[in-house]
Amino acid sequence: MGKRILIVDDAAFMRMMIKDSLNKYRYHVLGEAENGAKGVEKYNELKPDLVLMDITMPELDGIQALKKIKSMDASATVIMCSAMGQQAMVIESIQAGAKDFIVKPFQADRVLEAVKKVVG
């Protein structure tokens, strides 16, 4: 069984695209969430090896969700994905504990490269 991954993004098509790409390479997407609050809940429930998380989402944005997850589990592994590739967002994500940052729109290869680098 491959690494277990949680995808958190408010866009269903984005979750599906990422899931399809990861499944092809034997990664196991064990859950999805459509906002940061649900992402934190799913993280607690599923304890994935990796979280791929969007930044701009309703209820709780990705950076707030990242901070909550890291406060509960300092060893949590999170990669942020967002169309907002501004330097400040990248820096804030990394300072909050993200292992990598993927700028949308991205190719499947970029997601796979980041996942391999972070969890193998």
Give the positions of each predicted feature.
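Active-site beta3 strand of CheY-like receiver
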Residues: 46-52
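Short, conserved "switch-loop" micro-motifs in signal-transduction and mechanochemical regulators
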Residues: 84-85
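Acidic catalytic/metal-coordinating carboxylates
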Residues: 35-38, 61-64
